[in-house]
From Swiss-Prot:
UniProt protein name: Aspartate carbamoyltransferase regulatory chain
Matching Pfam families: PyrI, PyrI_C
Residues the entry annotates as binding Zn(2+): 112, 117, 142, 145
Classification via PANTHER family: ASPARTATE CARBAMOYLTRANSFERASE REGULATORY CHAIN (PTHR35805:SF1)
Family: Belongs to the PyrI family.
Gene this protein is translated from: pyrI
GO molecular function: metal ion binding
Record organism: Methanobrevibacter smithii (strain ATCC 35061 / DSM 861 / OCM 144 / PS)
Subunit description: Contains catalytic and regulatory chains.
Cofactor(s) named in the record: Zn(2+)
């Protein structure tokens, strides 16, 4: 099977940093917002949106040069793109590749949508805490008021 060279899309390789692949199509801008990108310190950020994927049909890809993501950032990304994978790149080579995994408990990343939840009172310094009910698509339940928060409501918090 020959590949038509004119139809290939080339995205420059990064020397060091992170590649987030298999992001749900058209969700990469949410990922950039979660990560606070672009910023003045990050040299290059490359975004490919709605590209063809054999695995998931359509996907987004984000490449971040000279930055490796921490666990909290990966947990946030898991809420938006639960099937994404993360590649750590050093000297142009992938040294670590992991699927993003939604933890069983999420603390402080999103807010409870129940206005009467104790976590939403200014005079109660309690961080929102959620138990993950479903991974694909993400659904969580508030630890305090037991409000179920569906994927759409989670995504709205990152818009």
């Amino acid at each position: 099977m020959s590949v038509d060279k004119k139809s290939e899309l080339k995205i420059r390789a990064i020397e060091n940093g992170t590649v987030i692949d298999h992001i749900t199509a058209n969700k990469s801008l949410h990922i950039l917002k979660i990560l606070g990108l672009p910023d003045s310190e990050t040299k290059n950020v490359t975004v490919a949106m709605n590209v063809s994927s054999k695995e998931i049909g359509r996907k987004d890809i984000v490449k971040i040069e000279n930055r490796e993501l921490n666990h909290e950032e990966l947990d946030q990304i898991a809420l938006i793109a639960p099937k994404a994978s993360v590649n750590i790149i050093r000297d142009y080579k992938p040294v670590k590749k992991d699927k993003i995994i939604l933890p069983n408990t999420i603390t402080g990343i999103i807010k409870c949508t129940n206005s009467k939840c104790i976590t939403n009172y200014a005079n109660e310094p309690i961080a929102p805490k959620f138990n993950v009910i479903n991974n694909h698509p993400p659904v969580v339940r508030c630890h305090y008021c037991e409000k179920l928060i569906k994927t759409e409501d989670i995504e709205k918090q990152f818009e």
